[in-house]
């Protein structure tokens, strides 16, 4: 029966799988539980898992492995401050870095900030501030951009100085946040709200345009204040001439004019108020004084009347004169006509011509003597106002060439600072173009001038698109490398007007053929060249960017440039490249912006002594929101990773990385704190820095009781201040020497990261041999 045994075994094998499966599952489960409890199992899989778990533990627990990395980061840190990305704000960070290193920009912003801070203090001291508050809010809002720029400049300089003096405190990064400036831009232009990518050239035009408007507003306010002061002084002189008597208001005005004269340099002429100073004591006997007063006055209609009639009519004439002078404020020509009967037959200049040519009129009035004494009073007060406001940074009248000998040098020095301040954009970035049209028949020329702040040049020929459509083999045919001079020649090319677009000549009196050219008439200190790297493309349509795709055609860019070929007059000016804004990406609404800046002019570097105070004072004096509460208040609902420096007595190297987990929409970025509140807190950082020193001095004086101890302490404090001044000078010289190591080197600013770029690598990225995605977008040349 051997054949039956295999059949039984087969039958068992058929019915056994279910049983074996049950047994095998239970067996494997028991085996896994044993593996979990048995620590002496030496299988290969267990060894692998133990090694993997051990590696995980080794990566987390020891801190010694991460220390070499931090040391390398500390060595790689450069003494240049980056800017944190606050959510697709690389377009703003790159422009701010270029403006920071732009020659003369920081000086002009500081000058404007000092003027604005003085104006704000004047508004606080004004008794009628409540009545004028509504009309001053708009001007303060327009001043906020200047205050935000100055606040950012101060924070960058202080952080740079702190790093150079204490480099061991900074291990992670050396960067600050332009949050206040970003909030100001969002207030001025709601387009920058949210976290969308924007054009770097547009934000540059927005910043420069608002600075220019602020400068014009400051000019108008200074001229208005000067006109109001001249009107008030003129009213006082007219009241004296009309009434012939002395009232309480005249006594106050005479005292004010006497105080004014004491402050001014003395001349060889006398004022009428000096001869009448004795009459102030005898103001009770008006009837006896009326006769000598009328003899000293000019020939007016009031002299023909009797003495009693004059005294009775005096109080009636005063309000009439005041009303006429008040109504004459809007138009100065009318005031000249109405008040002409009070003056002699000689022609009197208008008020506007007075404060436009103060020196000339003042010298003429002094030579004529007593008949022009009242006008001399007006000119004296106007001279005082002009000198005070010029010394304080206010506008100086263009015609004030003849000045007192003592203040001529001061005015000439302040005039240059005033021009840099009020004409910051015009001097640095704004030039003038001439559109010249020449008739081909009569050879007559017509010119039209317009201002420009940047030059937009092409990077490829217009016919290239037609070639791409006709070519079937290669979508990007190889073309010869274009240069920047070729691009500028395309911008200033001669255009021939023919056919239906003929030019109507005024000399020929009919339509003729003409040539139109664009030339440079006035060149600024800094030339901004905008490369038109984005063009409309139907094949690669970008719904967010409006169909603008990137043109990656390389353009040969020189380090030195001369525009004499396209200028209206011969010039020897040459420009050197000092900054480039690069764009990497394929569309205008995406990608990333970086800035490359060449460090130059460190020998003429001017550092503020307020940036080299003690760390505690430095932290208290920073106008940027540096504490956690202020940063959270200004951050609002930002969903990005930012670094916050702890204020107070903490070290500035402590960096806290915070991230909000609240969900926000595409157009988020709402602000919880208004910009003017930040302006009120940090409009004058010098005062904030100075307050701890004053508190220490007051505490020291309160501890002493005797005068001798106070004098000793004053001597010690004076010695300490001398030592501190020497220490500040040593710190400043050390910082300057440390920065001179980077003279002539190119720095790459990639938001918060700063790197040194070799000149060869920079030239390769500037004029690449291939067509990379990272190409130059904005070129900045400064006058050499």
Curated annotation (Swiss-Prot):
GO biological process, one term: response to UV
PTMs per UniProt: Autocatalytic cleavage of USP1 following UV irradiation inactivates it, leading to an increase in ubiquitinated PCNA, recruitment of POLH and translesion synthesis.
Catalytic center residues: 90, 592
CDD domains: Peptidase_C19O
SUPFAM superfamilies, sorted: Cysteine proteinases
Species in which this protein is naturally found: Mus musculus (Mouse)
Record bears the keyword Cytoplasm: no
Protein name, entry field: Ubiquitin carboxyl-terminal hydrolase 1
Organism phylogeny: Eukaryota, Metazoa, Chordata, Craniata, Vertebrata
Ranges of compositional bias, category Polar residues: 7-16, 693-708
GO cellular component, one term: nucleus
Chain positions of site Cleavage: 669-670
Keywords: Autocatalytic cleavage, DNA damage, DNA repair, Hydrolase, Nucleus, Phosphoprotein, Protease, Thiol protease, Ubl conjugation, Ubl conjugation pathway
Cellular location(s): Nucleus
Domain USP as annotated: residue spans: 81-784
Pfam families assigned to the protein according to its UniProt record, in alphabetical order: UCH
Sites of Phosphoserine modification: 16, 42, 67, 474, 767
UniProt similarity note: Belongs to the peptidase C19 family.
């Amino acid at each position: 029966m051997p054949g039956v045994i295999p059949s039984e075994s087969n039958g068992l094998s058929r019915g056994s799988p279910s049983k074996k499966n049950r047994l095998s599952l239970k067996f494997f489960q028991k085996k896994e539980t044993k593996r979990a409890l048995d620590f002496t199992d030496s299988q290969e899989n267990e060894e692998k898992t133990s090694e993997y778990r051990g590696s995980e533990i080794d990566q987390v627990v020891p801190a010694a492995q991460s220390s070499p990395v931090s040391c390398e980061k500390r060595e790689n840190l450069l003494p240049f401050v980056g800017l944190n990305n606050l959510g697709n704000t690389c377009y703003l960070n790159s422009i701010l870095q270029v403006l920071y290193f732009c020659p003369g920009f920081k000086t002009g912003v500081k000058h404007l900030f000092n003027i604005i801070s003085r104006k704000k203090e004047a508004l606080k001291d004004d008794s009628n501030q409540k009545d004028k508050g509504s009309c001053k809010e708009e001007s303060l809002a327009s001043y906020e951009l200047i205050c935000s720029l100055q606040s950012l400049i101060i924070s960058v300089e202080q952080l740079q100085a702190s790093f150079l003096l204490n480099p061991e405190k900074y291990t992670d990064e050396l960067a600050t946040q332009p949050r206040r400036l970003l909030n100001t831009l969002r207030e001025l232009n709601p387009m920058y709200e949210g976290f969308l990518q924007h054009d770097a050239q547009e934000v540059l035009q927005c910043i420069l345009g608002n600075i220019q408007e602020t400068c014009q507003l400051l000019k108008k306010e200074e001229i208005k204040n000067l006109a109001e002061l001249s009107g008030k002084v003129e009213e006082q002189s007219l009241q004296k001439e009309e009434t012939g008597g002395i009232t309480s208001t005249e006594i106050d005005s005479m005292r004010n004019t006497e105080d004014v004269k004491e402050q001014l340099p003395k001349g060889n002429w006398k004022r009428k108020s000096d001869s009448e100073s004795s009459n102030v004591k005898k103001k009770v006997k008006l009837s006896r004084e009326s006769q000598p007063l009328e003899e000293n006055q000019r020939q007016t209609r009031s002299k023909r009347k009797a003495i009693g009639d004059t005294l009775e009519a005096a109080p009636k004439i005063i309000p009439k004169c005041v009303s006429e002078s008040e109504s004459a404020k809007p138009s100065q020509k009318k005031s000249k006509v109405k008040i002409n009967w009070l003056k002699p037959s000689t022609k009197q200049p208008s008020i506007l011509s007075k404060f436009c040519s103060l020196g000339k009129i003042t010298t003429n009035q002094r030579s004529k003597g007593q008949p022009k004494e009242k006008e001399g009073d007006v000119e004296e007060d106007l001279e005082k106002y002009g000198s005070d406001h010029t010394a304080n940074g206010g506008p100086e009248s263009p015609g004030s060439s003849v000045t007192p000998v003592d203040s001529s040098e001061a005015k000439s020095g302040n005039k240059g600072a005033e021009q840099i301040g009020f004409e910051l954009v015009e001097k640095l970035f704004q030039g003038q173009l001439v559109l010249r049209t020449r008739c081909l028949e009569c050879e007559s020329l017509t010119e039209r001038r317009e201002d420009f702040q940047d030059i937009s040049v092409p990077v490829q020929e217009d016919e290239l698109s037609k070639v791409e459509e006709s070519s079937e083999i290669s979508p990007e045919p190889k073309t010869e490398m274009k240069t920047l001079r070729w691009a500028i020649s395309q911008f200033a090319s001669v255009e021939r007007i023919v056919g239906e677009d003929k030019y109507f000549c005024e000399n020929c009196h009919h339509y003729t053929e003409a040539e139109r050219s664009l030339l440079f008439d006035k060149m600024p200190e800094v030339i901004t060249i905008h490369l038109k790297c984005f063009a409309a493309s139907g094949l690669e349509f970008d719904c967010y960017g409006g169909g603008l795709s990137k043109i990656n055609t390389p353009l040969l860019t020189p380090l030195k440039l001369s525009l004499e070929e396209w200028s209206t007059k011969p010039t020897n000016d040459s420009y050197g490249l000092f900054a480039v804004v690069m764009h990497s990406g394929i569309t205008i609404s995406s990608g990333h912006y970086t800035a490359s800046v060449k460090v130059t002019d460190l020998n003429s570097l001017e550092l503020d002594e307020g940036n080299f105070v003690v760390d505690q004072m430095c932290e208290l004096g920073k106008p940027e929101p540096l504490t956690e509460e202020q940063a959270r208040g200004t951050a609002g609902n930002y969903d990005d990773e930012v670094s916050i420096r702890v204020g107070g007595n903490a070290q500035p190297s402590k960096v806290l990385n915070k991230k909000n987990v609240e969900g926000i929409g595409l157009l988020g970025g709402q602000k919880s704190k208004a910009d003017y509140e930040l302006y009120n807190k940090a409009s004058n950082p010098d005062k904030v820095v100075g307050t701890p020193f004053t508190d220490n001095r007051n505490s020291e004086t309160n501890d002493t009781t005797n005068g001798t101890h106070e004098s000793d302490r004053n001597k010690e404090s004076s010695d300490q201040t001398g030592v501190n001044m020497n220490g500040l000078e040593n710190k400043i010289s050390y910082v300057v020497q440390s920065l001179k190591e980077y003279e002539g080197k190119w720095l790459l600013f990639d938001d918060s990261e700063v790197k040194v770029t070799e000149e060869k690598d920079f030239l390769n990225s500037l004029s690449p041999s291939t067509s990379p995605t990272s190409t130059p977008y904005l070129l900045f040349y400064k006058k050499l």
